[in-house]
Amino acid sequence: LYLMVILEGLEIGQLKNTLKEFAFHKRECDKVISFKTDIPKLIPHLETAASPSHIYKILFPLSYEAVVLVLLEADSPELKAKVKDYLQHYSRVQIHLKGEDLKGLGIVPGPRFQEILKCLLYARLDGKFKDREGELDYLKEIL
């Protein structure tokens, strides 16, 4: 995180040279370069994100450090609020149903499991239900 903040002002070429010169590990180099190249592309999507699930989909693939940097880079109070909501609330939301529950409902195990569980998570983030019973009702409704 500190490294990304310190090197944030460099252009991409300068950044790569600096990282190479100081012999940082590939993992750190990749994180810093990813921040420099990917985060600016995410900001417009995040600005237009209206629902908690949309905000989650945008920020979830990022490392914690990158999300914090998005917060630091955010210009508007609305964007800062979205990132804070993700860090404080959305990133901690979990669903109650698991694969075994899906099997119990007669759903055949496979790639569809992950899709169904993601759909449940997104619906939970958007406040469509709050408990296990709500998840079951919602699942029966969408299947």
Language model region names:
Residues 1-143:
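C-terminal subdomains that position terminal phosphate/3'-OH groups for nucleotidyl transfer/ligation
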